Each structure stands twice: as C-alpha cells, then as structure tokens.
Amino acid sequence: MKRYDLPVALLYNTANIRYATGTDVMVVWTAGTFARYCIVPAEGAPILFEYKGSVHVSRKIVDDVRPAYTWQYGGLAARGKAREWARSIRDTLRELGLERERLAVDKLDATGFLALQDEQIPIVEVLPATVDAREVKTPEEVQLFAINGAIGDAILGEFEAAIRPGIREFELHAVLSDALLRRRGEGLFTRLVCSGANTNPWLTEATEKMVAPGDLVGVDTDAYGYEGYLIDISRTFLCGDDPTPEQREAYRVAHDCVMGMHELVKPGISFEEFARKAPRLPEAYAAQRYPTMVHQAGLEDEGPGIPYPDDTRGPRRIMPQRELKENMVLCLECYAGKVGAPFGVKLEDQVLVTKDGPRLVCAFPYDPKLLA
C-alpha cells in the first residue's frame, strides 16, 4: 500500500479479507454478499467488520472485530442503511487519523459507492496493491501449498479409482468433493467433471451422463484446499485400457504444450516473452484452445495471467507488463480438442516458481496409456 501511496483500504473481496486478517466465514455465501469487510491502514492493524452472527468466531483471531453494517437485503430502505454504513466508515477513518485520505476499495455495489460519495470520501482502486502483495508467496504460504499438493494428489487418486462404466459425472464430482473434505479442504468452486462428448468443447460441468467404456474423463479440481489455498490441477483419464490413436494424439498435444511451458518457468522472464516462446497448438486444435495459458493461484484463482498473444476471439485480453518472480504459484494449462470431435483433453499443472525453475505443487502423474 505504501508503494502505491494508499494510506488506507476498504476490502470486501473474501480472499483479500482472509489475506489481511487470517479469517474466513461462510465463504460461499459471503463471497456473493456485502456482509463482512475490513479496513486496513498502511500503518497499523486491520479492523474487521464481521457478519454480526459470526463476531465470536473472528475474535479468536483478530484483536479488533466489530459488527458489520449491511444494506443488501434492505429493500427500499437500503439507501438509508448504506448512508449509515458510510458514516461509520467516516468515523473509523477519523478514529485512525485518516479522515481526509483517499480510501482504496476492491469491490462495492452502486448503493455503497453512492453512499461514500454522499459522505465525500474519495475512492481509488486498491487492485495494484493487493495483486503485488499476494503475488509472491510467503514462506508460510509455500508450506501450505506443499500440504495442499499432497491433498491434490490424494483426491485425484480417489477420483481415478472411481472411474468405471455406468458411474455418472455428478457421482464422480461427489467423489472428488468427499475426498477433499475428508482431508480438511474447504470445497470445490466449479463442477468441471465431464466425459465422452461432454469433454468437447471444454467447460461443460458435471451432468447425469453415464461414463461409457472408452470414454475420456476430464476433471479440473478447482478446489479450495487446507486453509483455503487453491488446488488447481487438470487431468484427463481413460475409462478402459485401449485408447484410440485420435485420443492419444489429443493427449500428446495437450501434454507437450504444458511441458513446453514448464521449460519457460524461471524468475525474470516477462509475461510477453513467455507468451511469445510458449508452444503453439497445431492448427486443428487452435480454434478451441483454452482462453489463457497461465494464471496464478493463491487464496483464489489469481491474476494477472498470461494470455495467448495472437488471440482474436472476442475482446482482446490484456498482456500484463510483468515478469515471473520466485515463489509465485502458476497454473499451466492446455485444452486440446478439435471442433466437432467426440472428445477433448484438458491438462493443467500447478507449479511453484523457484530459482531453479518450476517445482510441481501436485505431482499426480499423467496417464501412461494415453502417452504411449
């Protein structure tokens, strides 16, 4: 915050709150509400405004916890409640000696924004500071990723063992969730389990479809693991023992793409250089490639990521003017599926950037049958 000349921040993003305070309450619900927030001065300890019913939970961790104001369910009275909240923000800034300073905010709805305007509190963007703070992992975070890497390997092992003809996609998703929760993971934030034709194009979530003999079965774990840190690895399995030549080809394309990105991971390489040197998919697979080749991971799917430099589909993605740094955590991913084909392959590795190159967070192996 000091680097960006931000004296004080108001944080509503659940991952930012957890990073600043170490607390997390009912993450799925609070992520979609404005029920809890914190004020973080550049100098001094954060003040957590907790959902009123959960104040006792956070007081075990944070010294200064106060009941949160919320207007979200106030109907026609919401604007008045938001003004009351804005006055409390003004009072807290005055208490901190920061009443006349700019307030850096991560997210807010229109009602809250207008209420702060009414109080003449100047608002600026906090994103550059939170990205820089969370991008390079601390030694404690690196240890948590090591713990979660082992959890990721275990849950994928149970998932693979459950694949059989007749099991439904949503049942496989349940296997993944159960395996995660039994190891003190916190939950899955997508349902990306699919089989057969549902693997092409990618991003079809779990359905009632039964897995058939010879199907490819794809999974992206997309999991909040122990202490909320991301377990994000993709694998594609075969239901059976005899892949077709076409299945092997798609698997090899995705595998070689991810392995080629491994070779580029080192501190100091710019995002632009990485994107320029990364493997290109064969033309037959390019139309349905994954939107980005790399994203970051922490307490959530994090950015900035690395897009394909030649992507002309839809709004052009920004190529961040950044470089890889030691102790960043990256997810290197590739989808290989031809348009109209009855299958596709999604592979993704999660790696820690070290001075010697990438270190796997999850070491779950690739399928030797599909690589043969």
Regions found by a protein language model. Give the residues of each.
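Active-site neighborhoods and metal-handling regions in enzymes and metal-associated proteins
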Residues: 1-372
